[in-house]
């Protein structure tokens, strides 16, 4: 009995904190690894993000969503809210007929206008067939944001209770243009903080 009391005295607080952390991870937070280039340049392949669960979903949040027809979580940006009409015309976003800026796209849109991202897709991380494929997609596109048929002008009406999610690298992202809108229950949390790699640690 004394041995058990001594154990609790020495390790009880540590075990309590460990238990609380484990419970908080189940209910309040998680982490996710970015896979692929769909969120370039905001988030890079292999980065690890801290995700907070049960937050209200707001426009332009970066969220983690679960694909119903797949078995993986994806990281995308919220563009369309329930009931919205989303329209793109030659890289301009209109939300319910109001033109809306997307400053997080400015860098890649400039690169697209400069050389259709050929230099970007020839750099580190785009070696081999992947780079060749990405360059061919970019060459074919007449705008940075196009639909699945490469139309530069297109629109979506977001159903009530659902959200339109797009990647920041519109040319290579598989998102709501391909799989449709996402129900609220399929959005598992909001990415709030990048903690890996150390050189890129911080908010975004």
UniProtKB/Swiss-Prot annotation:
Protein name, UniProt field: Signal peptidase I
- Record topological domains on the Cytoplasmic side: 1-10
- What membrane topology does this protein have? Single-pass type II membrane protein
Does the keyword field hold Disulfide bond?
no
Any one GO CC term of this protein is: plasma membrane
CDD domains linked to this entry: Peptidase_S24_S26 (cd06462)
The record lists the lineage as: Bacteria, Bacillati, Bacillota, Bacilli, Lactobacillales
Keywords attached to this entry = Cell membrane, Hydrolase, Membrane, Protease, Transmembrane, Transmembrane helix
The UniProt entry's GO biological process terms, in alphabetical order, are: signal peptide processing
Q: Which residues lie on this side of the membrane: Extracellular?
A: 31-204
Asked whether the keyword Cell membrane is assigned, the reply is yes
List the Pfam families hit by this protein, alphabetically: Peptidase_S26
Q: Which organism is it from?
A: Streptococcus pneumoniae (strain ATCC BAA-255 / R6)
Q: Can you provide one Gene Ontology molecular function annotated for this UniProt record?
A: serine-type endopeptidase activity
Localization: Cell membrane
**Which residues catalyse the reaction?**
38, 76
Which segments cross the bilayer? 11-30
Per its UniProt entry, which superkingdom is the organism in? Bacteria
